Amino acid sequence: MDFRAGLENVLQQEVTVIHGEETRKLCIANNKYLNGKDADTFRNLAVLLDHLGERSAKAQKLPKPVTSFIKFRNSDQSIFLLSDIPVKKFVILIYMFFRVLGFLKVGRKRLFVHDSKGVCVECIPLCILDFYIHESHQRKGYGKKLFDFMLKTENIQPSYLAIDLPSMKMIQFLHKHYHLINPIYSPNNFVVYSEFFNNLNNSNYSIVQSKLTTTNCFLKSNSSRIHQNKHNHSIVSNNNNNNNNNIIIIIIIQNITHHNNQLTIEQ
């Protein structure tokens, strides 16, 4: 994926980290009329992120991209861009073209995840949200290089991560390069590994609560009562005549399905 000049202020090394907060500031500045050079950078960055999101969605066979400039600038996520920075030619011609080889998007999300024993934990781990390496550069080590850079930057172990809707290729990638086995699927389509729960006290986690259960995850609510509908899913309605302020909402976990959406990566 080649991009013309206009990103030399952004892509200055092999792996560049872009944060949503910084992009928001650039967006605000753009509304206040940037100078020509900064405006060019802003526009090219928007085009780049939109294009990467579209390529990733196409590779995963998703109905729409999960990564776009507008979504990213309104988030607290980070994108790691892997690029092939060309050698400077003389002094005048600097970075005329950029080859972007792929990207990795991470961010923290509040999740309910279950271990193999049925323990339900609400936590805010770092998540792998999108991962794409251009088809012409897969199976050449670029995926691992990008992933390793992210791990070092975030100071985190692979087993501490939650992965959003990983494909079999992603599972194989984690097994091959990081020796992770026996993925644990949660109803929200996130996958974790057993080591995830062994390190819940690690500073990389923010634990909200933990409840022991088998097929149900129990939460507390105020002034509510439970009704079961014909599909066996729990629904909650208010009960003004109920003076009990501490009842339990039961969330029935049923019909867990695994989608075939894929994160395109290099193995």
UniProtKB/Swiss-Prot annotation:
One of its GO terms (biological process) is neuron development. Keywords: Acyltransferase, Transferase. Transmembrane segments: none annotated. Residues 1-197 form the N-acetyltransferase domain. Its EC number is 2.3.1.108. The record marks 60 as: Crucial for catalytic activity. Gene3D superfamilies: 3.40.630.30. Acetyl-CoA binds at residues 131-144, 167-176. It catalyses: L-lysyl-[alpha-tubulin] + acetyl-CoA = N(6)-acetyl-L-lysyl-[alpha-tubulin] + CoA + H(+). GO terms for cellular component: microtubule. It holds the Pfam family Acetyltransf_16. One of its GO terms (molecular function) is tubulin N-acetyltransferase activity. Specifically acetylates 'Lys-40' in alpha-tubulin on the lumenal side of microtubules. Promotes microtubule destabilization and accelerates microtubule dynamics; this activity may be independent of acetylation activity. Acetylates alpha-tubulin with a slow enzymatic rate, due to a catalytic site that is not optimized for acetyl transfer. Enters the microtubule through each end and diffuses quickly throughout the lumen of microtubules. Belongs to the acetyltransferase ATAT1 family. This is Alpha-tubulin N-acetyltransferase.
